Amino acid sequence: MNIKLIAIGKTDNKSLQTLIDDYTKRLSFYIKFDLEIIPDIKNVKNLSESQQKEKEGELILSKLSATDQLILLDENGKTFSSVGFSEELQKKMNSGVKTLVFVIGGPYGFSETIYKKAQGKVSLSLMTFSHQMVRLFFIEQLYRGFTILRNEPYHHQ
């Protein structure tokens, strides 16, 4: 199985980017992982929230193939413990999913088109985080999930 994380907009904070790069490298020992950044939409001042979500949705859809399984990182998604998330990853691998795609949306969330296309939603927390920090937290949780599946000493119960 391959895992792809799609996010809108680049990470401006160099310290965060360094950590994202570190966990991305660590994760590559367990699974093929790609972080794909969609550039911020230009001239958003001239767009309504729904128009911006639609444009971002079109860009997200252009990055997907027909066989991808799409999971949205969404505040209303299902929450997991780290162990529960690792079990969910194992189920996806066992089910024969070729590419599991997680998406961090733009500042206003996702368009209805994206919600309809998604096979699931995951929430990292009831708290709100910057989208740049969500990238780091999520990639770290992927890494943690794979160390749990391999019974490696990174995660402590």
From Swiss-Prot:
InterPro entries: Alpha/beta_knot_MTases, RlmH-like, tRNA_m1G_MTases_N. The keyword Transferase applies. Its main location: cytoplasm. One of its GO terms (cellular component) is cytoplasm. GO terms for molecular function: rRNA (pseudouridine-N3-)-methyltransferase activity. It catalyses: pseudouridine(1915) in 23S rRNA + S-adenosyl-L-methionine = N(3)-methylpseudouridine(1915) in 23S rRNA + S-adenosyl-L-homocysteine + H(+). It is found in: Cytoplasm. It is an enzyme of class 2 (transferase). CDD domains: RlmH-like (cd18081). SUPFAM superfamilies: alpha/beta knot. S-adenosyl-L-methionine binds at residues 73, 105, 124-129. Pfam families: SPOUT_MTase. Its EC number is 2.1.1.177. Specifically methylates the pseudouridine at position 1915 (m3Psi1915) in 23S rRNA. HAMAP family: 23SrRNA_methyltr_H. Belongs to the RNA methyltransferase RlmH family. Homodimer. This is Ribosomal RNA large subunit methyltransferase H.
